[in-house]
């Protein structure tokens, strides 16, 4: 990600009504830029592209360095993830799930990652459904500074078993 080049796009995404759980909905471009200047100090931030242009914003972080790490024993092979889809140009059934799987495959392509940790807002039911479909298990509800969240984990094995079962059920 190139913050100087991408800030207008990021601002337009995080201020969308569907992005309310990012907590930046009413923020200015200046505030969003300073937020991301801070985020990129401790996270890897990616903009994912398809042939048609940018499709996702992905933050990958070390849970030991974040508030979530105070709520469970962090392992060396853990990676935290925040994912935001680009505003849809048109609705396409299954599209978000395909992108979600792409991100999971991307993360698990690293031999350093064996478990993905997420802490979605307790009220974010759409992401709960995607997480469950991918094999995430809810450990517990936690209180983070900015939200009430579900602490969820998905191991590499759980993910690939779930994906395999999903494929078999579709046949």
Question: PLM features: residue spans?
Answer:
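Active-site rim helix/loop that mediates acceptor-substrate recognition in acyltransferases
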Residues: 24-45
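Conserved beta-strand in the GNAT
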Residues: 47, 53-66
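Conserved acyl-donor/pantetheine-binding loop and adjacent beta-alpha core of acyl/acetyltransferases
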Residues: 60-83, 87-91, 95
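C-terminal "cap" of GNAT-fold acetyltransferases
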Residues: 77, 144-171
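Conserved active-site alpha-helix within GNAT-family acetyltransferase domains
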Residues: 122-140
């Amino acid at each position: 990600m190139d913050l100087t080049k991408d800030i207008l796009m990021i601002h337009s995404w995080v201020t969308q009504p569907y992005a309310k759980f990012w907590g930046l909905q009413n923020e200015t471009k200046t505030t969003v830029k300073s937020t991301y200047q801070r985020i990129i100090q401790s996270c890897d931030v990616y903009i994912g592209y398809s042939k048609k242009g940018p499709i996702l914003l992905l933050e990958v972080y070390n849970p030991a360095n974040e508030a979530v790490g105070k709520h469970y024993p962090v392992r060396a092979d853990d990676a935290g993830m925040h994912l935001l889809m680009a505003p849809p140009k048109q609705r396409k059934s299954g599209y978000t799930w395909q992108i979600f799987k792409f991100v999971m495959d991307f993360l698990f392509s690293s031999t350093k990652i064996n478990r993905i940790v997420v802490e979605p807002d307790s009220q974010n039911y759409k992401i709960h459904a995607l997480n469950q479909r991918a094999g995430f298990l809810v450990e517990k509800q936690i209180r983070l500074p900015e939200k009430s969240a579900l602490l969820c984990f998905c191991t590499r094995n759980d993910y690939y078993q779930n994906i395999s079962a999903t494929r078999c059920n579709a046949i």
